[in-house]
Amino acid sequence: MIMEAINLEKIKTQMRKGVLEMCILSIIHKKKEAYASDIMEALKEADMIVVEGTLYPLMTRLKNASLLNYSWRESTEGPPRKYYTLTDKGLSFLNEALASWNELQTMITKLI
């Protein structure tokens, strides 16, 4: 019984990881631009809790893949902030990911 619970948690974690990039890109696209705490807040509101130690390396990976750009802006609340925007490649990737997500949902719905 305990082994089943461990496997279920592992499966749930893997499913979240599998869609996290798509969710982050979607948040940035909806907001037009987003600061890291905006992204974390949106994920939290959707009950997708992500820690900074997960988010920042992922953002770097998306930037290195040319899916995101960023710019620094002064902040009245402290140090300058890094704001992210989607590149054209990022938007294309997001659209393809969303199409794949919709196909997957359709397939799963037929099975359950």
Set out the residue ranges of the language-model regions.
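N-terminal helix-turn-helix DNA-binding core of bacterial DNA-binding proteins
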Residues: 13-54
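Amphipathic alpha-helical dimerization/coiled-coil segments
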Residues: 91-112
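Basic, amphipathic "hinge/linker" alpha-helix immediately C-terminal to the N-terminal HTH DNA-binding motif
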Residues: 76, 80-98
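A cross-family signal for key residues in well-ordered alpha-helices
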Residues: 23-26, 41, 60, 95, ...
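Basic amphipathic alpha-helical segments that dock to polyanions
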Residues: 55-57, 61-62
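Beta-hairpin "wing" of winged helix-turn-helix
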Residues: 65-79
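Short, Lys/Arg-enriched N-terminal segment that forms or immediately precedes the first helix
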Residues: 1-13
